[in-house]
Amino acid sequence: MQLEFLGTGAGSPSKQRNVASVALRLLEERNAIWLFDVGEATQHQILNTTIRPRKIEKIFITHLHGDHIFGLPGLLSSRSFQGGTEPLTIYGPVGIKRYVQTSLQVSESRLSYPLHFVEITDDGELFNDHGFRVIARKLDHKIACFGYRIEEADHPGELQVEKLREQKVPSGPIYGQLKAGKTVTLPDGRVLDGHDFIGTPQPGRIIAILGDTRQTKNAILLAQNADVLVHESTFAKDETKMAHNYYHSTSKQAAEIAKKAGVKKLLLNHISARYTGKAAYQLAYQVRNIIPDTRVVNDFDVIDIPFKK
């Protein structure tokens, strides 16, 4: 599981940063890519990665400001042109369906795959297939805006092979049955419960990806005990008033949310073009006294999300 940042800038593209988009790479987990926001030129950014558009299974839009959606029609068309046939689902605020359908109709674009929409009106669960669960909550922005919490299901514990060998259990199909938690009767009459030979389950990973927002309780709820929080940092830590007026956050406010939520790693994105070079990295440096594992992400950064130790 990895996060790959395709655009980390705020408002409009700059030479250093494209506008908002981040890919959650779930190739090992479900052979799929999930995108969060699709700013202008996202498909061009993808050309500089190993992402294949036909692998994109779901797209989650935080809100309908242009820097988060202007790349969507082009990406959808290219996915079709490149041979995509698998269904794709777009989640987002009310209006996302009309925006996409109008863009495709006016441009007379035809897609080679089924396109589904889930328009969000309130907080709640969007998706749950027992492998992953996605929850959306409203944030505090100028227009309807949502954050997303992605929860991976716990992984079953490992089969304790040494314990089986100690009890002289013959290897073979029996091991598979025990690993599945089944009760097995051996040729010598012994009855074994598979649960007695399975280790502690591996907790699933949790990621929170937020859209543009002021500080809000829902941000804490979304990020509660997350392994990674992706939070906007449009303004530096001392620009609290400006952040409030523009419905955005400072780096310090993002770190405070992470601290209250018990987050392990904070990734700051949605960086204003006013912060370049060292000034951008200062956004993270200034708040590491709150969350030590904080970094400002750049376009094309890839962040591994390991299992909890």
Swiss-Prot record:
<protein>
    <recommendedName>
        <fullName>Ribonuclease Z</fullName>
        <ecNumber>3.1.26.11</ecNumber>
    </recommendedName>
</protein>
<dbReference type="GO" id="GO:0042781">
    <property type="term" value="F:3'-tRNA processing endoribonuclease activity"/>
</dbReference>
<feature type="binding site">
    <location>
        <position position="67"/>
    </location>
    <ligand>
        <name>Zn(2+) 2</name>
    </ligand>
</feature>
<comment type="similarity">
    <text>Belongs to the RNase Z family.</text>
</comment>
<comment type="subunit">
    <text>Homodimer.</text>
</comment>
<keyword id="KW-0479">Metal-binding</keyword>
<comment type="function">
    <text>Zinc phosphodiesterase, which displays some tRNA 3'-processing endonuclease activity. Probably involved in tRNA maturation, by removing a 3'-trailer from precursor tRNA.</text>
</comment>
<keyword id="KW-0378">Hydrolase</keyword>
<keyword id="KW-0540">Nuclease</keyword>
<dbReference type="Pfam" id="PF12706">
    <property type="entry name" value="Lactamase_B_2"/>
</dbReference>
<dbReference type="InterPro" id="IPR001279">
    <property type="entry name" value="Metallo-B-lactamas"/>
</dbReference>
<feature type="binding site">
    <location>
        <position position="63"/>
    </location>
    <ligand>
        <name>Zn(2+) 1</name>
    </ligand>
</feature>
<feature type="binding site">
    <location>
        <position position="212"/>
    </location>
    <ligand>
        <name>Zn(2+) 2</name>
    </ligand>
</feature>
<feature type="binding site">
    <location>
        <position position="141"/>
    </location>
    <ligand>
        <name>Zn(2+) 1</name>
    </ligand>
</feature>
<feature type="binding site">
    <location>
        <position position="68"/>
    </location>
    <ligand>
        <name>Zn(2+) 2</name>
    </ligand>
</feature>
<feature type="binding site">
    <location>
        <position position="212"/>
    </location>
    <ligand>
        <name>Zn(2+) 1</name>
    </ligand>
</feature>
<feature type="binding site">
    <location>
        <position position="65"/>
    </location>
    <ligand>
        <name>Zn(2+) 1</name>
    </ligand>
</feature>
<keyword id="KW-0819">tRNA processing</keyword>
<feature type="active site" description="Proton acceptor">
    <location>
        <position position="67"/>
    </location>
</feature>
<keyword id="KW-0255">Endonuclease</keyword>
<dbReference type="GO" id="GO:0008270">
    <property type="term" value="F:zinc ion binding"/>
</dbReference>
<keyword id="KW-0862">Zinc</keyword>
<feature type="binding site">
    <location>
        <position position="270"/>
    </location>
    <ligand>
        <name>Zn(2+) 2</name>
    </ligand>
</feature>
<dbReference type="InterPro" id="IPR013471">
    <property type="entry name" value="RNase_Z/BN"/>
</dbReference>
<dbReference type="InterPro" id="IPR036866">
    <property type="entry name" value="RibonucZ/Hydroxyglut_hydro"/>
</dbReference>
